Design a protein with these regions (language model features):
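Nucleic acid-machinery interaction/catalytic patches
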Residues: 1
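Membrane-embedded alpha-helical bundles of multi-pass enzymes
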Residues: 7-215, 265
C-alpha cells in the first residue's frame, strides 16, 4: 500500500517540503548530475500528492513545481534580459509565469492521483508519464526537464537505449514510488512489504545492469558516411542583429563550400540562419547549384 496521511502535519511544513523537494530536483540534471536527487525530489512530490486533503496537495504540488521550474528554466533570463532587451524584473516575471503554466501538469498528476485514490507505483508512473507527454505536446510543448535525462549516469542507464527518455522517466517515477514505499514500510516495520519492494528494485537493477552490457548497435560493413557539423560560433548579441545577417550567411556559406563534395552530410545548427527562408533564397539557390556540380 502506498499511502501517507498528513492530517496531523502542519500545512506550512508540507508546503516547505514540497518547495525544497522541487528545488532539489534541478540538481539531478546537468551540469550538477546528482542523479540520485531525482528520487529525493520525486519522493517529496509523491509525499504531498497523497495528502488526504486535495486542496493542500494541489497547492503543495504547485509550490513543488515553482521550485523545480523557476530554477530549472532560469537560463531563460539570459535570453530574455541580456539578449531580448527586457528589464531584469520583466524577465523574472516572464520566467515565473512560464513556470506557473508548467506547474499545471504536475498539478494534473496530483489531481488524478487524488481522484482515483491511486496506490500502485506503476499507476503513479503512468499518470506522471502521461502528464509529461502533454507538457511536451500542448501548444507545441515544452519538454525540458524530464527526469529520464537525469539517469544516464545512474546504474539504470542500461535500459535507456530500449525505452528512451520517456521510458526512463516512467521508470524514475516508478522507482521513486517504490523507494518511498520501502522507506515507509521500514518505518512501520512492515517487513513483508520491505522485502517485496527491495526485491523489485533488485530485479529491475539487475536487468538494467545486464542490458547495459548489450551492444544494441552493430557496425554495418562497407563504406561509412562522412558527416560534417558546421558551427559559426557567432555571439548571441550579433546573431539576432539584422545588420549582421549577411555576415552570418557568409560564414556558413564558406564552411559549407569547404566540405561540399567531401562530406555525405553537412549539418548546421537549427537556428544557424536567423531569418525566413525567402529572405535568403539566392543563398540556397547558389548552394544547390554548386552541390549539383560536385
Amino acid at each position: 500500500m502506498f499511502f501517507c496521511s498528513m492530517d496531523k502535519m502542519n500545512k506550512l511544513v508540507v508546503y516547505l517540503i514540497a518547495l525544497i523537494s522541487g528545488v532539489i530536483g534541478v540538481f539531478a540534471f546537468s551540469p550538477f548530475d546528482y542523479w540520485g536527487l531525482a528520487y529525493v525530489s520525486l519522493g517529496g512530490l509523491l509525499f504531498v500528492a497523497k495528502n488526504a486533503q486535495k486542496s493542500t496537495a494541489l497547492l503543495a504540488t504547485f509550490l513543488w513545481s515553482m521550485g523545480f521550474f523557476c530554477f530549472g528554466v532560469s537560463w531563460l533570463n539570459v535570453s530574455i534580459h541580456q539578449f531580448g532587451g527586457a528589464s531584469l524584473g520583466v524577465s523574472y516575471l516572464l520566467v515565473g509565469l512560464l513556470s506557473a503554466y508548467l506547474a499545471l501538469y504536475p498539478m494534473l498528476f496530483t489531481y488524478l492521483v487524488q481522484c482515483f485514490k491511486v496506490q500502485s507505483a506503476v499507476i503513479f508512473a503512468a499518470i506522471w508519464t502521461l502528464t509529461e507527454f502533454l507538457r511536451g505536446w500542448v501548444f507545441t510543448g515544452f519538454p525540458w526537464l524530464q527526469f529520464g535525462y537525469t539517469q544516464i549516469d545512474s546504474p539504470f542507464y542500461g535500459i535507456a537505449p530500449i525505452f528512451g527518455v520517456t521510458g526512463m522517466t516512467f521508470f524514475t517515477v516508478w522507482a521513486s514510488a517504490v523507494i518511498f514505499n520501502l522507506v515507509f514500510s521500514l518505518s512501520k516495520k512492515q517487513w513483508n512489504l520491505v522485502g517485496v519492494n527491495a526485491l523489485l528494485l533488485l530485479v529491475v537493477g539487475g536487468l538494467s545492469a545486464y542490458a547495459g552490457k548489450v551492444n544494441f548497435v552493430q557496425p554495418k560493413e562497407g563504406k561509412g558516411l562522412t558527416i560534417t557539423l558546421a558551427q559559426g560560433n557567432i555571439e548571441q548579441n550579433l546573431k539576432w542583429d539584422p545588420e549582421y545577417l549577411y555576415a552570418t550567411v557568409d560564414i556558413y556559406q564558406k564552411q559549407i563550400l569547404a566540405h561540399l563534395g567531401k562530406s555525405d552530410l553537412i549539418i548546421l545548427p537549427e537556428s544557424a540562419l536567423p531569418t525566413l527562408e525567402n529572405a535568403i533564397t539566392p543563398f540556397f539557390e547558389a548552394l544547390d547549384k554548386v552541390a549539383k556540380e560536385k
